[in-house]
Amino acid sequence: MSWQQRVDDALTARRATDTLRRRYVVSQGAGRWLVANGRQYLNFSSNDYLGLSQHPQIIRAWQQAATRFGVGSGGSGHISGYSVAHRALEEELAQWLGYPRALLFISGFAANQAVITALMKKNDRIVADRLSHASLLEAANLSPAQLRRFIHNDTQHLSRLLQSPCVGQQLVVTEGVYSMDGDSAPLAEIQHIARRHHAWLLVDDAHGIGVTGDEGRGTCWQRGVKPELLVVTFGKGFGVSGAAVLCSESVADYLLQFARHLVYSTSMPPAQAQALSASLAVIRSDEGRERREKLAALVQRFRAGVNASRFTLLNAHSAIQPLIVGDNSRALRLAEALRQQGCWATAIRPPTVPVGTARLRLTLTQAHEACDIDRLLEVLHGAGE
């Protein structure tokens, strides 16, 4: 088989099963409205849960820092790319979340890959929830450690897997809020089981940080859990981009030596770090609390209004509200029907989600109004099959 045939066959297979992904060019993709091809849509696909990507205080912080530092960091943090803005943000994050150290990464994907590849050795075992993010599972598959996956949120299965003999160390991997199902992990029980088996716990709280818990401290804080490794990302609740790993002093020092994604990547721009500090200040303020309360009310309004006889709504109380459709082509048709009625929603299909669970991944944000939720429900019930 030639290179070209390999490429063509893979694309043909995706087209045949209605799983071919595509990108859409938008003029505005975050916030209440999405603008594409000159048309405005109510936006139910954005991860900008608190509406902070458009916050004037955060935009101004980025602009002012860009004037001071320039638009790039100029290098890896190990060379010349670790500025006072980066250090200040790391210290603020560590203090906020109650950890000795925080390390910044350019993305959540990079942070997850870096931690797993740096820590895991040949005789180790990773025990991950089977619905963990692709960045976690890919890193686990590529690492020399053994990967075992437990049934989603099934702590008994997790316990059985941890009980089997392991010569090396064990790492339990889960998420705070799951990106495709919108539900939360039973973190307290997972941590208890991990500690009983002398395993470390890694929690990716990309979709919980900023949005849940006291001062937006996330799912772990809300559940009274402190994992050895906490990954938080800044492209959702923070409204910006990037990520951080919260950990102990010694683990931070270890990652600075052995996390290749950190050592060999250009640091995020200092202006971005400054904007993230401004975003954190909003999240921790009374305004941040009010934004979280508004979002929670919108989620409750949506869930109360969905016709359960026509749609399968998962047990999710986060900003992520998936409607399970099942069939790939039906999910695509439903997404298109919503767009025709002015609501932008995304059909999620395998391999992102398991076969037979194609869905509309609806995301609600603080930028929405109650009338937007009512319009979404009206369109959904009119388009349902």
Curated annotation (Swiss-Prot):
Name of the protein described by the UniProt record: 8-amino-7-oxononanoate synthase
Keyword Transferase part of the UniProt annotation: yes
PROSITE patterns: AA_TRANSFER_CLASS_2
PANTHER family: 8-AMINO-7-OXONONANOATE SYNTHASE (PTHR13693:SF100), CLASS II AMINOTRANSFERASE/8-AMINO-7-OXONONANOATE SYNTHASE (PTHR13693)
UniProt modified residues of type N6-(pyridoxal phosphate)lysine: 236
Binding site for substrate: 21, 133, 352
Similarity annotation: Belongs to the class-II pyridoxal-phosphate-dependent aminotransferase family. BioF subfamily.
Gene name in the database record: bioF
Subunit structure: Homodimer.
Organism, scientific name: Salmonella choleraesuis (strain SC-B67)
Enzyme Commission code: 2.3.1.47
Molecular function as annotated in GO: 8-amino-7-oxononanoate synthase activity; pyridoxal phosphate binding
Record's function text: Catalyzes the decarboxylative condensation of pimeloyl-[acyl-carrier protein] and L-alanine to produce 8-amino-7-oxononanoate (AON), [acyl-carrier protein], and carbon dioxide.
Pathway noted in the entry: Cofactor biosynthesis; biotin biosynthesis
NCBIfam families tied to this protein: bioF
Superkingdom field: Bacteria
Cofactor requirement: pyridoxal 5'-phosphate
